[in-house]
Amino acid sequence: MFKTITPIDNTVYLERKYNHDKIEDTISNSVKAQKNWAALKVKERVEILKKFVDDLLSRENQIIEEITRQIGRPISQASSELKGFKERADYMLSIAEKKLSIINLPEKQNFKNYIKRIPIGVSLVIAPWNYPYLTSV
């Protein structure tokens, strides 16, 4: 059982059960989903991520309360993290197609040289406690 203790009053804010099999299943499902993700064009991925950002931000009040309870940040300051998250996400999504496009390099000895960025696997982000949403972008 994982417990989150709120620094506000040192009580248990939430508890999450886990087991090894569920963790393994989650990783396995992530690997399967990543193959589908990699098959999408960058433009399609960008559209999906824009919807994700909108969906996340539609829960702003809930997230602000969670940030406050989990890390003790005053509720009046917690919304700034989500504003920063949106600014970063919007910027990264605005440059994604250009930055992830194929880079053609000069040919050498009848070889076509290029750099192609492709999604190659699943990653796990363990965000720092002080800016859990902002640093996820």
For each feature predicted by the language model, list its residue ranges.
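N-terminal Rossmann-like NAD(P)+-binding subdomain of aldehyde/semialdehyde dehydrogenases
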Residues: 1-111
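Conserved small-residue-rich beta-alpha loop and adjacent elements
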Residues: 104-137
